[in-house]
From Swiss-Prot:
GO biological process: regulation of translation; translation
Signal peptide segment: none
Organism: Maridesulfovibrio salexigens (strain ATCC 14822 / DSM 2638 / NCIMB 8403 / VKM B-1763)
Name of the molecule in the record: Large ribosomal subunit protein uL1
Quaternary structure note: Part of the 50S ribosomal subunit.
InterPro entries in the record: Ribosom_uL1_bac-type, Ribosomal_uL1, Ribosomal_uL1-like, Ribosomal_uL1/biogenesis, Ribosomal_uL1_3-a/b-sand, Ribosomal_uL1_CS
Function summary: Binds directly to 23S rRNA. The L1 stalk is quite mobile in the ribosome, and is involved in E site tRNA release. Protein L1 is also a translational repressor protein, it controls the translation of the L11 operon by binding to its mRNA.
Pfam families xrefs: Ribosomal_L1
Top-level division of the source organism's lineage: Bacteria
Record PANTHER family: 54S RIBOSOMAL PROTEIN L1, MITOCHONDRIAL, LARGE RIBOSOMAL SUBUNIT PROTEIN UL1M
PROSITE patterns referenced in this protein's UniProt entry, alphabetically: RIBOSOMAL_L1 (PS01199)
Keyword terms of this UniProt record: Repressor, Ribonucleoprotein, Ribosomal protein, RNA-binding, rRNA-binding, Translation regulation, tRNA-binding
Cellular component per GO, a single term: cytosolic large ribosomal subunit
């Protein structure tokens, strides 16, 4: 078991508490942050779903009201008049065959990718490169669309894509420690509301089984699942 430094051990004091309110958990995560850089605040949600069934594979996206606190570099795989639309909306890299070829040569200097439906056959050629890195455009998350301008603006504004893993756990960032508790809570509420709306009818029992908030270097703070659900519905 790895040994943690004094700062981490000090930060973990009191984290054995469970059943915190949403407000308590977020405030504690911010208060206990100790790194010299502006840490990202992440949320882990254990859902009562079985991802091996396609109708229980929770996947989606949400535009956080306060963004993520970082510049998102967007690559748009488009052609024709859509190129000008993408550039005007603020896309960092725009192209068709040339952009696909660039990725084939090893270029991956972007954070999100958007494509029009007619370009997906060509983008599929680099699926093995984009997929494992979470960069593959997907219609379910709104990154395969003819409305390129809206997609670019949403991603730039702090649109977060999420997907449950094999264990049914969903991970997503909700901002930076420097945001302060109030803005982080607003972002978390948007995330919880979106996840709650995606509950499949085939999922039985408790949907939000466990929720925890943690900073990049800090410990996790467990939120009472019932409190999380009520917060998402308030």
């Amino acid at each position: 078991m790895p040994k943690h430094g004094k700062k981490y051990r000090k930060a973990t004091e009191g984290t054995e508490q469970i059943g915190l309110t949403v407000e308590q958990a977020v405030a504690s995560a911010v208060e206990k942050a100790y790194a010299k850089f502006d840490e990202t605040v992440d949320v882990a949600i254990n859902l009562g779903v079985d991802p091996k069934y396609s109708d229980q594979m929770i996947r989606g996206a949400v535009t956080l009201p306060n963004g993520l606190g970082k510049e998102i570099r967007v690559a748009c795989f488009v052609s024709g008049e859509k190129e000008a639309e993408a550039k005007e909306a603020g896309a960092d890299f725009v192209g068709g065959d040339d952009l696909v070829a660039k990725v084939k040569d090893g270029w991956l200097d972007f954070d999100k990718a958007i494509a029009t439906p007619d370009m997906m056959a060509k983008v599929g050629q680099i699926g093995r490169v984009l997929g494992p890195r979470g960069l593959m455009p997907n219609a379910k998350t709104g990154t395969v669309t003819f409305d390129v301008a809206s997609a670019v603006k949403e991603v730039k504004a702090g649109r977060v894509e999420f997907k449950v893993d094999k264990a049914g756990v969903l991970h997503a960032p909700i901002g930076k420690v420097s945001f302060g508790a109030e803005k982080l809570l607003e972002n978390l509420k948007s995330l919880l509301e979106t996840v709650n709306k995606l509950k499949p009818s085939s999922a039985k029992g408790t949907y939000m089984k466990a929720v925890a908030v943690a900073t990049t270097m800090g410990p996790g703070f467990k939120i009472d699942p019932l409190a999380a659900r009520k917060y998402s519905e308030s």
